[in-house]
């Protein structure tokens, strides 16, 4: 699997928690701040944090834990 992305914003405590969960799950994702892109902000504004797989376009919305991340990546 390639292209794992975590969408969030700065000063988002849930996004910080999501990053910790990814670390716990051993997953590496590119962090993209949606506040820097109007289209992303419109699409994800109230849904963040969201984990997205670039290969499939599948998304995992918050809340998630390490087990859910592992299942998502399987």
Could you say what each language-model-derived stretch is?
Residues 10, 35-36, 64:
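Short beta->alpha linker loops
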